[in-house]
Amino acid sequence: MERAVRSSLLTMVGFASYQGLRLLSNLVLTRILFPEAFGMMALITVFLVGLTMFSDMGVGPAIMQSKRGDEPAFLDTAWSLQILRGGALWGAACLLAYPLSLIYEEPALAWYLPVSALTLLITGFNPTKFETANRHMRAGRVTIVEIATQVVGLIAAIALAYATRSVWALVVSGIVSSVAQLLFMHVLIPGPGNRFRLEKAATQELIHFGKWIFLSTLCGFVIMQGDKLILGKYLDLDQFGVYNIGYFLASFPLLLGAMVIRRVVIPVHRESPPRQSRENFLRLRKMRFIATGVLMVMLLTVALLGVWLVQVLYDPRYLMAGPVVVALACMQVPQIIVLTYDQAALAEGDSQRFFVLSAAKAVAMTLSLLIGFEMGGLFGALIAQGVAMVAIYPVVIWLARAQGAWDPLHDLVFFGAGTVLATSVFWLHWDDISHLIQ
């Protein structure tokens, strides 16, 4: 438990630093570049994330939960598969660039996407000792690597933006960040390096575990990027850029929670399965109450201050991001409540149930976004994201009960408190939010 708390705190400090640097970069770049540049980069990011998730074999979770997760042969095989995947992703990006530029009616995508996709090729060479450090909850060096990488990317982005005043600044700085991350991982994280080899048994284990992760991440792409994929098609680039800034500010607590839980819950579940004893379940309940409470306070604080934050931090071109922050943060309350349950399945190696939950989320999110946007434009799409997460709660219960992790007391307490507080924040900012209704 002590290691888990220490790892959680280090992860939170690292993530706060990382997001703080991102915010600083965002603030500087919005004053150098134009809203359309952020809209274009958001589109590029959607496609890169899509390619990454469409080919995810779950190497990180596999290393964290496998009994062979510390064996050199297993780690080298995982690294080798990761390299092959990175090369395939870059090739796919090159092939898709021109067709996507036609679909989204943005000719520049044909040039930006292949160059940006070099980041996928580079990250394929990241050593597995990064995941080994996460497996053993040694978050100190991991945090240093993440912060150092972000600092390099920030400096590169600002310098290039000042020099070029174009989207190329964001594209090239992404490549610089990937190279820096690779170097920092090799230099700063202790442990042996990897060599290229494909052990048959390790390959079979990784593929067996990863086949459901692969399907889950297809769904995960829709869950995490579906709003941008749909809104990127129907909104103008400048409007889409403003939405993306609102999303960045609103999603800080959710992204923080997801990172902490991914790095801490899987090891804790592996060492103390909740269905093994009442003591283990109560220990997990305590962790869950603390985590959800902290994240919900952060989320609703962001919602309460969203309009003011945008007014203070950004120039008038981005003011509509304020009500986006408020609405989106309020709609993320259901996600915060159930955030720990899906990782419980991965901790048990049950990637099949994890896929079923991911598929349910993807279907609910897609249908809700399409219906919401059709009925209420951007406002409807924002509300839809909260509705989708409430709709799939029965599937969450099914998964959590199978792992002995479902805690109805926790869910009831935070759903009641979250609903009352989010409704109050919504009512307080209704005059601003109403401007989103089309």
Region locations from a protein language model:
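Transmembrane helical elements of multi-pass membrane transporters/channels
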Residues: S7-R22, T149, G153, L170-Q181, ...
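Interfacial segments at transmembrane-helix termini and the short loops linking adjacent helices
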Residues: F38, A97-S116, R278, L282, ...
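Alpha-helical transmembrane segments of polytopic membrane transporters and translocases
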Residues: S25-V28, E36-S55, T119, V179, ...
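Membrane-interface junctions at transmembrane-helix termini in multi-pass inner-membrane proteins
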Residues: V5, Q65-E71, I122-V145, W168, ...
